[in-house]
């Protein structure tokens, strides 16, 4: 992973972000993924995936899902380093590895994971 900062994440996501959205940096791990780096945005209605280029400096693809369309969700916080969130949507399987802590992002990662567990997961 290239050195990523909160400012970079905010700049890349600002035009795609809706009110009350939580943000995190993740590694997509499915065949449906466009690239191997992504910013995830989530609120009570919508989930947005912003796929990033190799250097995490540019959004190259965007996918949106309605929260109600996320099916067969699974969440695993197996170790202290990262959590795995998977689900099916739009006929495809999606899998994201979300680091639980990235020092340069402050509480961004944990805020996203807490929101996900409390408000989105069944």
Task: List each language-model region with its residue ranges.
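Acidic, Ser/Thr- and proline-rich intrinsically disordered linker/docking segments
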Residues: 3-4, 57-122
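Anionic N-terminal interaction surfaces
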Residues: 1-40, 122
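Residue-level detector of functional hotspots within protein domains
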Residues: 6-8, 26, 33, 51, ...
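Charged, low-complexity, helix/coiled-coil-prone segments
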Residues: 7-18, 49-64, 120
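Short, compositionally biased strand/turn segments
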Residues: 36-56
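A generic structural signal for ordered alpha-helices
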Residues: 18, 25, 48-49, 90-94
């Amino acid at each position: 992973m290239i050195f990523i900062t909160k400012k970079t994440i905010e700049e890349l996501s600002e035009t795609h972000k809706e009110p009350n959205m939580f943000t995190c940096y993740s590694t997509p791990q499915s065949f449906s993924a466009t690239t191997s780096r992504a910013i995830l945005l989530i609120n009570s209605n919508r989930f947005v995936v912003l796929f990033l280029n190799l250097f995490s400096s540019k959004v190259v693809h965007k996918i949106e899902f309605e929260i109600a369309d996320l099916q067969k969700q699974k969440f695993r916080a197996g170790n202290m380093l990262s959590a795995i969130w998977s689900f099916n949507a739009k006929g495809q399987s999606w899998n994201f590895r979300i680091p639980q802590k990235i020092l340069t992002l402050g509480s961004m990662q944990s805020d996203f994971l807490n929101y996900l567990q409390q408000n989105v997961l069944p």
